[in-house]
């Protein structure tokens, strides 16, 4: 019974070893010893051929097979070395698949030297554990992959990054002036007669719109300003004309002559009258309710002659008085 169990365990271990070397070998003879020897020889041959050709998928860790595994005898109660190797292969195969999934998400190693198969011979005595050997191989492979990845890493580009930093210019250069919106003062143009009459054949233009409206009433005949005096139905086109007419009813004469006591109700009548005086000057007349400073009037010629005679007589008296003394 123990021999049958040992044979089944050995066959399972053989299957694991063959699966790890990717060799399809399913030969089982009647004699377990002969079968084990044939399997070991076939496994060694296939693995050597694959190692010589250098085949193997990139990115997957290749695990070297355990060669020349001794066949357990029916008398021995435990096939510890062979079963330990099989269990190590099973654990490492699971670990290799997990590592491959992690490496597929990250950047793969650039160099292929980290996956080259290496040959080694297991101890015949079976006292040294095989699992420690595979752990050392895995650690060496990972370290070689990391070193090659660091060596093959691209150098940092010397181009300036987009971090927002402004490269420094020459020491004597000044920063460029800001190109913001510049406000210019509006040029003051001289006043022009922009308000032109729109009636056909009339080319008159005015500075103010109110003047244009009063002028257009001459074309339309409109007279919106009417006198409200009793029994007076006169109408006017301008308000100043109405005010002038209203003074005829009240008898107000606010424009007085500066050279005589006469008064007038209209400023043009006053100007016409003042020009008749020989000593008249335009600054003497009130202008829009304000009297301008009049020029000093020259004395009349009779007064000048009399003052000259008085001074000459007084000087003669003084000379005679001094002569008498």
UniProtKB/Swiss-Prot annotation:
Q: Which domain of life is it from?
A: Eukaryota
**Biased segments, Basic residues type:** 183-196
Which GO molecular function, any one, fits this protein according to its record? DNA binding
Start-end of Acidic residues biased regions = 155-165
One BP term from GO: positive regulation of transcription by RNA polymerase II
- Fetch the SUPFAM superfamilies from UniProt: beta-beta-alpha zinc fingers
InterPro entries, per this entry? Answer: Znf_C2H2_sf, Znf_C2H2_type
CDD domains reported for this sequence: KLF14_N
- Which keywords are on file for this protein? DNA-binding, Metal-binding, Nucleus, Repeat, Transcription, Transcription regulation, Zinc, Zinc-finger
Task: Cite the SMART domains for this sequence.
Answer: ZnF_C2H2
Task: Give positions of region: Disordered.
Answer: 153-196, 270-325
Cellular component terms (Gene Ontology): nucleus
Main subcellular location of this protein, as a coarse class: nucleus
Compositionally biased spans, kind Low complexity:
306-316
> Is the keyword Zinc assigned to this protein?
yes
C2H2-type zinc finger segments: 195-224, 225-254, 255-282
Location relative to the cell: Nucleus
Kindly give the Gene3D superfamilies that the UniProt entry links to this protein: Classic Zinc Finger (3.30.160.60)
Give the matching PANTHER family.
Answer: KRUEPPEL-LIKE FACTOR 14 (PTHR23235:SF59), KRUEPPEL-LIKE TRANSCRIPTION FACTOR (PTHR23235)
Question: What family does the database annotate?
Answer: Belongs to the Sp1 C2H2-type zinc-finger protein family.
Q: What is this protein called?
A: Krueppel-like factor 14
Organism of origin is Mus musculus (Mouse)
* Gene name in the database record: Klf14
